[in-house]
Structures are given as structure tokens and as C-alpha cells.
Amino acid sequence: MSDTALIFRLAWDVKKLSFDYTPNWGRGNPNNFIDTVTFPKVLTDKAYTYRVAVSGRNLGVKPSYAVESDGSQKVNFLEYNSGYGIADTNTIQVFVVDPDTNNDFIIAQWN
């Protein structure tokens, strides 16, 4: 199915859908570490969780932070990585996990 066909299929099924999962990566201290990623406008129809993987190593699934009043949501890597940020030389993958099916979908990747 083409991207266009998928979009119009969603428009038919859902009617109104507004989201923005463009990742905003937050650097730590020192600044060669990534501490967070924030998604500007997330889906709120379910209590989605996130799974984080670093260079192919699964760091697990954690409960998500509350959605902010502007619709954004933050994923804090310190909670996945024993209180440490993730070196920006690594590949960081963030997956959103559907609470109904436990299926996960990649939503952001660093490197």
C-alpha cells in the first residue's frame, strides 16, 4: 500500500487524526549525551508506552510521562539507562507500544 493510500485509508477509518511525532532530541551534560526525546503532539486515544533500544540492545518498556497541555510528551532516557544519558555515538531507537496488542512501532531514530 502506498503512503498516500495509507493516509486516505486512515482518513476514512478515523476521520480526524492529528499528531506530530517529529523527534526533538534533548542533550544532557556533557552535551555528547542524549537524555530525552520529546514528541510535539502525540496520540491520546490510549495509554501508549515506549520501548527504547540502543545500538540493538533493548532497554525495555517504561510507563510514559503525562501528555502536556500542548499535546507533547517526553521520553526520559535516564529512566531506561540506570540514570545515565545515552552517548550520541550510539543508534537510539524509540518505539511506541500499543497497550491493547503490545505491538511496537518505531517512531524515532538517532543516528
From Swiss-Prot:
Gene Ontology terms, MF aspect: carbohydrate binding
Similarity comment: family membership: Belongs to the fungal immunomodulatory protein (FIP) family.
One Pfam match: Fve
GO BP, sorted A to Z: regulation of immune system process
Protein's UniProt name: Immunomodulatory protein Ling Zhi-8
N-acetylserine: residues bearing it: 2
InterPro entries assigned to the protein according to its UniProt record, in alphabetical order: FIP_sf (IPR036344), Fungal_ImmunoLectin_sf (IPR053742), Immunomodulatory_FIP-Fve_fun (IPR015339)
Keywords for the protein's UniProt record, in alphabetical order: Acetylation
Lineage: Eukaryota, Fungi, Dikarya, Basidiomycota, Agaricomycotina
